From Swiss-Prot:
Lineage: Bacteria, Pseudomonadati, Pseudomonadota, Gammaproteobacteria, Enterobacterales
Pfam annotation, one family: PUA_4
One GO CC term on file: cytoplasm
InterPro entries, A to Z: Alpha/beta_knot_MTases, PUA-like_sf, RsmE, RsmE_MTase_dom, RsmE_PUA-like, tRNA_m1G_MTases_N
Location in the cell: Cytoplasm
Annotated protein name in UniProt: Ribosomal RNA small subunit methyltransferase E
Methyltransferase keyword on record: yes
GO BP of this protein: rRNA base methylation
Subunit structure: Homodimer.
Catalytic activity: uridine(1498) in 16S rRNA + S-adenosyl-L-methionine = N(3)-methyluridine(1498) in 16S rRNA + S-adenosyl-L-homocysteine + H(+)
Family, as annotated: Belongs to the RNA methyltransferase RsmE family.
Source species: Buchnera aphidicola subsp. Acyrthosiphon pisum (strain APS)
Example GO molecular function: rRNA (uridine-N3-)-methyltransferase activity
Function: Specifically methylates the N3 position of the uracil ring of uridine 1498 (m3U1498) in 16S rRNA. Acts on the fully assembled 30S ribosomal subunit.
Length: 253
């Protein structure tokens, strides 16, 4: 049996399991996890895994059997580990090109965003082509799990079904603070003086916002704020905005 000291002194690979877990129980890994453990990590019988399952707990498990088709593990330790920020950031990200959108999802999760809704305008190219979002959502969810595995988050942020920007604004008429980041705004982050626990933010895609779009979003109660004097790429803007908010109101203090 591995001691707590042995666990602390060794970097233990993390995997995500959807199942409800309990101590001293046996589980079989999914095909995806089996491939990752055997082909990527090259793990063997008796090696230890750290498991997260979308709760505030992590489990340690020992590999007890490996074959071509199965990996059997047994849990032996459970630890409460809450790394979630007290600031709930809901990112409304206007969908950008594939690799940029992937980057935005990955990095925003690593720095603490809790909910992501991909957004689009009616005249966007993929909307005209009536692209089925199901495959994109599956890809984004995998990116979210991978980001959590890397950064030690145990609660996987929600990636919601893509929505029209204005429908999203209309459906989120609550008491949350709302911000749209725009390089031509005269307001800066310094205008946010009161404590914030829940906030919704909109980040544009590569094309930015047309003036009529910008004005309509403001009418839904979104405060226009700029992120410094420079114009940022869409994937940079999301990281900068979330980092600034985490520094002011979250767990980057």
């Amino acid at each position: 049996m591995f001691t707590s000291t042995a666990i602390k002194n060794k970097k233990i690979p993390r995997i995500y399991i959807e199942d409800d877990l309990d101590l001293n129980q046996f589980y079989f890994l999914s095909d995806e996890n089996r491939h990752y453990v055997t082909k990527v990590l090259r793990m063997k019988i008796e090696d230890i895994l750290e498991i997260f399952n979308n709760t505030h707990y992590i489990f340690f498990a020992k590999i007890i059997d490996i074959s071509k088709k199965i990996i059997k593990i047994q849990t032996f330790k459970k630890i409460l580990k809450n790394l979630e920020s007290p600031l709930h950031i809901h990112l409304g990200q206007v969908i950008s090109k594939n690799e940029k959108m992937d980057f935005t999802i990955q990095k925003s999760i690593e720095i603490g965003v809790k909910t992501i809704t991909p957004l689009f305008f009616e005249n966007d190219h993929f909307q005209k082509k009536r692209i089925n979002f199901s495959n994109k959502i599956k890809r984004w969810e995998k990116i979210a799990i991978s980001a959590c595995r890397q950064c030690n988050r145990n609660i996987i942020p929600k990636i919601k079904i893509p929505m029209n920007v204005f429908h999203w604004c209309e459906n989120n008429q609550n008491n949350d603070k709302k911000i749209i980041f725009h390089p031509k705004s005269t307001l800066t982050m310094k205008c946010l003086t009161e404590p914030i626990k829940y906030i919704q933010i909109i980040i544009g895609s590569e094309r930015g916002f047309f003036n009529d779009e910008f004005q309509k979003i403001i009418k839904y109660g979104f405060i226009p704020i700029r992120l410094g004097p420079r114009i940022l790429r869409t994937e940079t803007a999301s990281v900068v905005a979330i980092t600034a908010l985490q520094t002011m109101f979250g767990d980057f203090k």
